[in-house]
């Protein structure tokens, strides 16, 4: 049900390469109508673009006397527009590639679904995935709602200009938020399949350990079944890794610009928080509460992104490596099984799942924490710059 909601949001925002029906992308006549709708939607986003930077925000708002607030406002808008354009261009120039990726992802999910035997382990996994997916959709909707409430609280006598600015910002915000949520959902689905593979590998290890304790030899039938299952799991794991790499390659530029947008928004939010805390900006208790929830939703979204990327890269490899080591003590299995196990281990060792953003830096939990620390440093620099301006004005 939650995946259906995400699909509806993706179709509504023009973020799908084509509509889906019974697990297959619709092409031809029906796709043509969807392309027309997407073109109109993207045309609308371009039409409202000039209203993103209204004059009254610089001359007749709370930031009119603070150059740092104007600078962060401009930078936040520019990075959001850049992220939005990266998504728009991706949908038009790489549509076939995204279609192929979507078809391969659906096929991979169907293969991994055959491993799910409705046992307690798989039920717990489904609940865990459902919980994360619910959080992603909740945070996306909450971020849009809170962003709209904050925009409505900005006072201005120019009502038409203010309304146009709110429409421009909300439409851009909806597009960017669901673009990031869509990428997170794709990675979450791949992580779900990886977890299914790990459960199946654990079950195979438990079965062989049971045979090791209770039998002197492993029958030909059981040996062949075990070897076949290990080979199947290895093939599915390699396919899962390939799809993860393909997702990162396809969405590399949008992810990089979304991370840049998150960084700038982070600086903007923390700096606003400092200004509100010092009572430099006049505000009501209602605006203060909404602002606090904006900060919470932003960091919640950042943590979800950080966790899902870490799950499909570093953590997935560590878990799989630990599971493969549990097979090392088995003695009843045949030489072919050990060779297949060695092949699995070599593949894992030679193809580590890491994500380099545009080939510049590895994105994982460690770099994310360093990024949060760097934001605080940047805000301290901005506060010092702000204090320097105040001293110069007094003199």
Curated annotation (Swiss-Prot):
GO terms for cellular component: axon; dendrite; membrane; neuronal cell body; plasma membrane. Expressed in the adult labellar chemosensory neurons. Glycans are attached at residue 278. Belongs to the insect chemoreceptor superfamily. Gustatory receptor (GR) family. Gr22e subfamily. It is a multi-pass membrane protein. This is Putative gustatory receptor 58a. It is found in: Cell membrane. GO terms for molecular function: ligand-gated monoatomic ion channel activity; taste receptor activity. Keywords: Cell membrane, Glycoprotein, Membrane, Receptor, Transducer, Transmembrane, Transmembrane helix. InterPro entries: 7TM_chemorcpt (IPR013604). It comes from the Eukaryota. It holds the Pfam family 7tm_7. One of its GO terms (biological process) is monoatomic ion transmembrane transport. The lineage of its organism: Eukaryota, Metazoa, Ecdysozoa, Arthropoda, Hexapoda. Probable gustatory receptor which mediates acceptance or avoidance behavior, depending on its substrates. The chain crosses the membrane at residues 33-53, 73-93, 132-152, 170-190, 251-271, 289-309, 367-387. Its main location: membrane. Residues 1-32, 94-131, 191-250, 310-366 are cytoplasmic. It comes from Drosophila melanogaster. PANTHER family: GUSTATORY AND ODORANT RECEPTOR 63A-RELATED (PTHR21143:SF131), INVERTEBRATE GUSTATORY RECEPTOR (PTHR21143). Residues 54-72, 153-169, 272-288, 388-395 are extracellular.
């Amino acid at each position: 049900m939650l995946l259906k909601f995400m699909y509806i949001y993706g179709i509504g925002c023009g973020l799908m390469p084509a509509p889906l029906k019974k697990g297959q992308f619709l092409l031809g006549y029906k796709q043509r109508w969807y392309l027309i709708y997407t073109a109109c939607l993207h045309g609308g986003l371009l039409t409202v673009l000039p209203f993103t930077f209204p004059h009254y925000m610089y001359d007749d708002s709370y930031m009119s006397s603070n150059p740092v607030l104007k600078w962060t406002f401009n930078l936040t808008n520019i990075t959001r527009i850049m992220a939005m354009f990266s998504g728009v261009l991706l949908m038009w120039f790489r549509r076939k590639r995204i279609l192929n990726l979507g078809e391969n992802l659906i096929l991979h999910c169907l293969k991994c679904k055959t491993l799910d035997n409705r046992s307690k382990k798989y039920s717990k996994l489904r609940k865990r995935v459902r919980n994360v997916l619910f959080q992603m959709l909740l945070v996306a909707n909450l971020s849009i709602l809170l962003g709209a409430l904050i925009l409505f609280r900005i006072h201005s006598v120019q009502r038409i200009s203010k309304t146009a600015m709110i429409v421009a910002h909300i439409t851009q915000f909806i597009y960017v938020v669901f673009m990031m949520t869509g990428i997170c959902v794709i990675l979450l689905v791949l992580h779900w399949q990886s977890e299914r593979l790990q459960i199946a590998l654990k079950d195979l290890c438990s079965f062989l350990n049971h045979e090791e304790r209770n039998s002197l030899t492993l029958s030909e039938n059981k040996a062949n079944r075990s070897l076949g299952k290990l080979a199947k799991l290895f093939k599915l794991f390699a396919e899962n890794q390939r799809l993860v790499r393909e997702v990162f390659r396809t969405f590399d530029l949008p992810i990089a610009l979304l991370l840049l947008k998150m960084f700038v928004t982070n600086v903007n939010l923390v700096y606003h928080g400092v200004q509100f805390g010092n009572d430099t900006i006049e505000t009501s208790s209602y605006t203060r509460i909404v602002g606090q929830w904006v900060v919470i939703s932003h960091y919640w979204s950042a943590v979800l992104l950080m966790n899902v990327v870490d799950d499909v890269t570093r953590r997935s490899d560590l878990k799989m490596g630990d599971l493969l080591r549990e097979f090392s003590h088995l003695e009843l299995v045949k030489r072919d099984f050990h060779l297949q196990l060695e092949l699995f281990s070599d593949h894992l060792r030679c193809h580590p799942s890491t994500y380099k953003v545009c080939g510049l830096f590895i994105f994982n939990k460690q770099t994310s924490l360093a990024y949060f620390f760097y934001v605080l440093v940047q805000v301290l620099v901005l506060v010092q710059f702000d204090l320097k301006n105040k001293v110069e004005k007094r003199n």
